[in-house]
Amino acid sequence: MDVNPTLLFLKVPAQNAISTTFPYTGDPPYSHGTGTGYTMDTVNRTHQYSEKGKWTTNTETGAHQLNPIDGPLPEDNEPSGYAQTDCVLEAMAFLEESHPGIFENSCLETMEVIQQTRVDKLTQGRQTYDWTLNRNQPAATALANTIEVFRSNGLTANESGRLIDFLKDVIESMDKEEMEITTHFQRKRRVRDNMTKKMVTQRTIGKKKQRLNKRSYLIRALTLNTMTKDAERGKLKRRAIATPGMQIRGFVYFVETLARSICEKLEQSGLPVGGNEKKAKLANVVRKMMTNSQDTELSFTITGDNTKWNENQNPRMFLAMITYITRNQPEWFRNVLSIAPIMFSNKMARLGKGYMFKSKSMKLRTQIPAEMLASIDLKYFNESTRKKIEKIRPLLIDGTVSLSPGMMMGMFNMLSTVLGVSILNLGQKKYTKTTYWWDGLQSSDDFALIVNAPNHEGIQAGVDRFYRTCKLVGINMSKKKSYINRTGTFEFTSFFYRYGFVANFSMELPSFGVSGINESADMSIGVTVIKNNMINNDLGPATAQLALQLFIKDYRYTYRCHRGDTQIQTRRSFELKKLWEQTRSKAGLLVSDGGPNLYNIRNLHIPEVCLKWELMDEDYQGRLCNPLNPFVSHKEIESVNNAVVMPAHGPAKSMEYDAVATTHSWIPKRNRSILNTSQRGILEDEQMYQKCCNLFEKFFPSSSYRRPVGISSMVEAMVSRARIDARIDFESGRIKKEEFAEIMKICSTIEELRRQK
């Protein structure tokens, strides 16, 4: 029997069929090799968009810098970065006029945050450029290294633990004539192995002191390391992203705090909220535009796309915005906030690893590091690379490139949103002073513009005016990639609006399935994804039930844990059958131990262990939830964990799931190969750091855990806490007298050791 596919949709409103257009089934593309070429592309493009600006030389670093601000206005539709200071300031003034007190209040909120933020705020985030080692590191390690170097150079304000005091050290460090740092290096020796009598290469890790003069230090402090953005779908070419170092991070954080506070108060801003809250906020703006348009008026919506948003933004413009926003505030506050844009105006982009060369016969390979690009003969490169290098040479200093104009990806998302909204704000009739008016939505570089006018000419005029107003502040709406529709149908930040936002369930498809963390987490994440999609994405009960069955099937194949009474033979089936036969209450076995699946769409919110606890044999309970089980490198788990799920589009999302610690919550061991490299010292530091933090959390369970303020160190805080807890436990009879005495003795020993040190 033939089925006509159109019949499937007879009862379905057209907008609900969006999930059937899903193109992203396979793995997303990842980048290999170096990002050097992509970074050079970014730098060259950025300079091209601002080429009519003024060239200057930075007196401290000697870097050549291009300043396009207040440059000539473009005469064509090509993207350009010539923002006009007075236009930006005026847009800010009108934004404030429409929202009385918005800047004032946001400044007060930010000042409060600045007073309270601790320096460990900077340990959040993934890879960070570590200027002491000149490469990327996890954020916590990079921060620890920076503080260690600061202290050994006599900068000690950071010891208070407040972020603002750490930033005082950063400012002071820039005035120092030299900074002494410790770097890791490795020595290789050929030695004979006693056992096998073969020659082996032995690596030893050394640390050596190195002095950086003021110029070298400034270059490192202003450096953004670059990498290639991975897993981007729908693009032919990869592109570069940047990670700033610890000197810049803190200042950026405070600027973004201020901008976030402003965005929260702007109804057109798609940041900082997300999910359903964002949809509600946006639906409001659309509703407002549709209800306010008189019956005779036309209303059109542009699904907007901006050309090279980051590369045409300018830190100098952000400085002007901050200067205006904070104009009646105390001097110290204005200074703290203006440092980030000033540093970005003088930023250097690190070119990454450099180029790899292979000989024709593929026998020889050699790496040309970025530092050599200034002097190497260009005959070895192909035409396009040669052009790139020629363009970039005047800007090169020690393997970094001077990049004054432009903002690298994702640095000032909130502040650039404020700029975008300020242009949307100018669409009110009292500002356009004519028959057309506009409003819209802005979220970083993505926008939707709603224009109302009595006739088509008016709509066209409104769009033109918006386009030209944007040009004045360095925003380039792409005429090729933006399209216009009757209001009621548009797309914004991958939300599709058609008389209300349409659930695009297919976006979530890549996050269904088995994550591959461990048996316990995978089960929990799998059912949570299904539950969340029933709540947020119109996943109906029948489809959810099907998704659940498919997930269980997938899970059993992944972990080879088919039911104990199945005929399927796998490596594990022998053991699982034995367990099945020994178990009295078979319903109590976890799926990963060959048990049956008890999940249905009504109980997805219950962790599997809790769901089956009452059904388990007693000895099975004892084995499963036993922290002393010697065969398991056991991981303690907070009651809620975070998993990273990948939707098809947009950034990886963090999703909470319930975690019950069982013997299935194992962690795979770290790959050995890292232990032989110069990373090893860093790894050990990191583990020590981790252990200290874990220990500390033991003493201060998160409910009662306030970071020790004042001078007491972590150790002192833990010792005093141990004494208090021990006394309470002793007096209430929870511990014996001998145990109490032993705890007190250990505490005294620790204090004694500290005094000796």
Swiss-Prot record:
One of its GO terms (cellular component) is host cell nucleus. Its EC number is 2.7.7.48. Phosphorylated by host PRKCA. One of its GO terms (biological process) is symbiont-mediated suppression of host mRNA transcription via inhibition of RNA polymerase II activity. A motif (Nuclear localization signal) lies at residues 187-195, 203-216. Gene3D superfamilies: 6.10.140.720. It is found in: Host nucleus; Host cytoplasm. Residues 56-78 are annotated as: Disordered. PROSITE patterns: RDRP_SSRNA_NEG_SEG. It catalyses: RNA(n) + a ribonucleoside 5'-triphosphate = RNA(n+1) + diphosphate. Residues 286-483 form the RdRp catalytic domain. Keywords: Eukaryotic host gene expression shutoff by virus, Eukaryotic host transcription shutoff by virus, Host cytoplasm, Host gene expression shutoff by virus, Host nucleus, Host-virus interaction, Inhibition of host RNA polymerase II by virus, Nucleotide-binding, Nucleotidyltransferase, Phosphoprotein, RNA-directed RNA polymerase, Transferase, Viral RNA replication, Viral transcription. GO terms for molecular function: nucleotide binding; RNA binding; RNA-directed RNA polymerase activity. InterPro entries: RNA-dir_pol_NSvirus, RNA_pol_PB1_influenza. RNA-dependent RNA polymerase which is responsible for replication and transcription of virus RNA segments. The transcription of viral mRNAs occurs by a unique mechanism called cap-snatching. 5' methylated caps of cellular mRNAs are cleaved after 10-13 nucleotides by PA. In turn, these short capped RNAs are used as primers by PB1 for transcription of viral mRNAs. During virus replication, PB1 initiates RNA synthesis and copy vRNA into complementary RNA (cRNA) which in turn serves as a template for the production of more vRNAs. Belongs to the influenza viruses polymerase PB1 family. Influenza RNA polymerase is composed of three subunits: PB1, PB2 and PA. Interacts (via N-terminus) with PA (via C-terminus). Interacts (via C-terminus) with PB2 (via N-terminus); this interaction is essential for transcription initiation. HAMAP family: INFV_RDRP. This is RNA-directed RNA polymerase catalytic subunit. It comes from Influenza A virus (strain A/Ann Arbor/6/1960 H2N2). The lineage of its organism: Viruses, Riboviria, Orthornavirae, Negarnaviricota, Polyploviricotina.
